Amino acid sequence: MRELFCARAIRAGYRGHEVVHGVSFSLAEGELCALLGANGCGKTTLLRAVCGLTRGEGDCLLEGESLWRMSERERARRIGYLAQRSRELPRLSAMEVVMMGFYPALSPLQRPSAAQRLDAQETLAQLGAEHLAGGDFSKLSEGQRQLVLLARALVRRPRLIVLDEPDSALDFPSRRRALRLLRETAQANGACVLLCTHDANFALRYADRLLMMEAGNLTGDFALDSAQREPLRCALTRLCGPVELAVQGGRYAVLEGDGP
């Protein structure tokens, strides 16, 4: 698969405190990569740096172009981003929030087209959330908001999709639909997905690749279709505590131990 995204020696933090220490990795077209780590290890800071929301040293390249040198508007056209926590968007319907995903591609006086509205409706439907379209976004549950914001991140079919704990508030059926759509979007459009999670089984079940992060450094990188059991188990044990791995449906699964 062709390399689509490359992070080069990223150092980033906040208020003068470095949190991410020279992290490098690349993502290929169609790849869904999970970033696994404990609270406070730097996952969110790394994802924000990838999106140009937190600046530091190094660089992030998408299709050979520096994301950090692009305008904010151009980055927003290339990246679909879902933050860890939703913010209040008063007096907007769920459909209006999803339609905001088109704004970076429109001129200041343009409005989304009828075709784009249909795309927004279809994306909500693919997430099982079409019934939320007319609802007041501010009155939705956290899980419902997460689905709407995920639809906003995906509706424009961006080349790079960055998701901070997209599974944290979703029930199991919603989680399955969301991951199915992410995989279909990545493969159909040649995009790549980088998502962070605390749930080792979630990562093992759905990702093509697993990155592990500890104290601001990447400490593991496994292609899950070819990873050997014992090195993967040892890496997960170091990160999560004692675990055993089984193969279920052709994929690894954690049998024991708590997630980070």
Segments from the language model and where they lie:
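Catalytic Walker B motif of ABC-type/P-loop ATPase nucleotide-binding domains
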Residues: 161-165
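The feature captures the beta-strand-to-loop junction immediately N-terminal to the Walker
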Residues: 36-38
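ABC ATPase nucleotide-binding domains
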Residues: 230-260
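Conserved ABC transporter NBD signature motif
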Residues: 58-66
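H-loop/switch region of ABC-family ATPase nucleotide-binding domains
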Residues: 197-198
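Helix-to-loop junction immediately C-terminal to a conserved catalytic motif
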Residues: 51
